[in-house]
């Protein structure tokens, strides 16, 4: 819970940064708060163990000789060093089967047995590709374990030999080496950059061709995801430049698994900062990425929404590239998607558009998305309501008076005020700031807005917030009461009624200036 508060505080600090600094109003992806943004998808793990389908079955037909209960590690280690090729291959195969057939493979036991150097030596045996394959497979599964277990493989000097095996004439050996390297790269930025420094990218990308079997290409794409993953630090710029052309090819692939991983790779790159966002934009891939927001597979939609969502955390210019691809036309479906997590991510995306310039705010209005945001503000699950509160509050900073007046016309005040009673202090602050901003912008129409707030029970909620434990909240609640609700003469003064707009809707006096200070505390 403390981590959530810390992240939310940072988010709020960024949001309120130095007046109308629109770039800092854009909010980076918050992996702890937004569950959708956590990667706990089986097909997208950092590390993967190679377990043959037949080994998953309980009544596996593994020969009894290789079953754990009938196989002593000591004998396996001894036989793995045998000069007899048949005995050696059987022993290495036995080790591999121990590592791939068990739900809880005895990785530590095998490491302690001293077999690692023997397996690594087997990788050098060009005269025996079957032995290379079995040894690579065993090492792949050791590297699929904890960080310490992966490090044991790295420290045994296996990586240069795996890179060498990428050039093996035997495809199964190549593929197993790719898998092993994927597990090592997936351990973290240090391992990633170490493998990159040894030259993994060019041979890896050379496998991408029409003739490659689909299972092999899936593995290659998954390794590319791991190369793009992690942003502390992000991958080297030259690596990104090498990988992007391949992603531009793979984004047209018909295989869903390959497409999903390609788009996740883009989402990781765009999560690293504006410089990386610009590299992705310059690759020309965005026009091919945006249509995936309406892909029939939810997995593809989710990844695409994340990737474009990251791009719009960038500058106004970078955001405009996404909008120019007709991105907003996909959002009515995303905002009404049966999966709440998609709704939440979609509103988060839009909150970064409403943090943009006035033309971008207008684009959201013109796409008829504001009523849908307000509906989710009212009826969505709490995570979605929270994102909607940010979207509305951002609009009160970025928008023109007529754009903020449009919020009032769409009846934003009641659902906005309803969030004043939630336990999440950041949401309460964001709503109070939005209300304060609307009231300040209304100027001589503030009385009418105040009446709307009072009629829906908002005034009572604001009064109660004067006793809130959070200093910022009770001060702002007091200021709102003091500035806009302290007068007793709430009569129908004609001068306080908003000027008429078509259809008798609200309008603010356009001669007054938009406040430039942003949210004030």
Swiss-Prot record:
Residue span(s) of domain IBB: 2-58
Segments of this protein annotated with the region NLS binding site (major): 137-229
Keyword annotations from UniProtKB, A to Z: Acetylation, Cytoplasm, Nucleus, Phosphoprotein, Protein transport, Repeat, Transport
Region NLS binding site (minor): start-end pairs: 306-394
Residues the record lists as Phosphoserine modifications: 60
Tissue note: Detected more or less in all tissues examined (Ehrlich ascites tumor cells, testis, kidney, spleen, liver, heart, lung, thymus, skeletal muscle, cerebellum and brain (without cerebellum)). Multiple-sized transcripts were highly expressed, especially in testis.
Keyword Transcription tagged: no
Pfam families listed in its UniProt record: Arm (PF00514), Arm_3 (PF16186), IBB (PF01749)
Domain of life the protein comes from: Eukaryota
Annotated positions of the N-acetylalanine modification: 2
GO CC terms: cytosol; male germ cell nucleus; NLS-dependent protein nuclear import complex; nuclear membrane; nuclear pore; nucleoplasm
Record-linked SMART domains: ARM
Similarity section: Belongs to the importin alpha family.
Domain notes: Consists of an N-terminal hydrophilic region, a hydrophobic central region composed of 10 repeats, and a short hydrophilic C-terminus. The N-terminal hydrophilic region contains the importin beta binding domain (IBB domain), which is sufficient for binding importin beta and essential for nuclear protein import.
Role description: Functions in nuclear protein import as an adapter protein for nuclear receptor KPNB1. Binds specifically and directly to substrates containing either a simple or bipartite NLS motif. Docking of the importin/substrate complex to the nuclear pore complex (NPC) is mediated by KPNB1 through binding to nucleoporin FxFG repeats and the complex is subsequently translocated through the pore by an energy requiring, Ran-dependent mechanism.
Subunit structure as annotated in this protein's UniProt entry: Forms a complex with importin subunit beta-1 (KPNB1). Interacts with SNAI1. Interacts with TALDO1 isoform 1. Interacts with CYB1.
Protein name: Importin subunit alpha-3
Organism: Mus musculus (Mouse)
